[in-house]
């Protein structure tokens, strides 16, 4: 992967996203691909709700570099295919969504699931199985309330498990998952709605492009870096 010097922390409002995270009970670390704010324009004011960070398995850099090295940060930012390669890439992802203001679990998951359903319908991947998965997804959040600083973690496998939906009172990763949902279209849709064609966090997309451009440059300069 990229050298440790290039994998820096990111601050989003009062939230700190460390360069590396290691879940409890695991020997595997994930590096921070990028982080940014999610918000909405409400009555001509941009209201910030969440800070989102995307962590990836080590081999993500070399996997993506095969196609994207040599591109500028601006070229990466303008390429939907780059983000789709992150979304569909053969490496694990750990997504952290930490709240900047209090959010009710039902209201939060209603909007997230609506965005996911809209995407899956637009690309023709929404069927009875996905409808069931969406219901599981909504049920996982129904009794939750998220005060500022609390976090939802989504751990995604290359096989499509949106698993290990993990809820935390702060930024630490609890040892036990809250729910596991085995549905690849939904798993991909969750990240698609964050960084895809209609992203809820343009700032996260920009962060990913800027940081991966640097990762690729370092990989080219140091081709013997382990992945």
From Swiss-Prot:
Swiss-Prot/TrEMBL catalytic activity: a chalcone = a flavanone
Pathway(s) of this molecule: Secondary metabolite biosynthesis; flavonoid biosynthesis
Binding site for substrate: 50, 115, 193
First and last residue of the signal peptide: none
Enzyme class: isomerase
Any one GO MF annotation of this record: chalcone isomerase activity
Pfam families referenced in this protein's UniProt entry, alphabetically: Chalcone
Positions of the record's site feature: Important for catalytic activity: 108
Domain of life where this protein originates: Eukaryota
EC number: 5.5.1.6
One BP annotation, GO: flavonoid biosynthetic process
InterPro entries: CFI, Chalcone_isomerase, Chalcone_isomerase_3-sand, Chalcone_isomerase_bundle_sf, Chalcone_isomerase_sf
Keywords: Flavonoid biosynthesis, Isomerase
Key word RNA-binding present: no
Record's function text: Catalyzes the intramolecular cyclization of bicyclic chalcones into tricyclic (S)-flavanones. Responsible for the isomerization of 4,2',4',6'-tetrahydroxychalcone (also termed chalcone) into naringenin.
Further comment: Part of the biosynthetic pathway for all classes of flavonoids, a large class of secondary plant metabolites, many of which are brightly colored.
Family to which the UniProt record says this protein belongs: Belongs to the chalcone isomerase family.
Name of the protein in question: Chalcone--flavanone isomerase 2-B
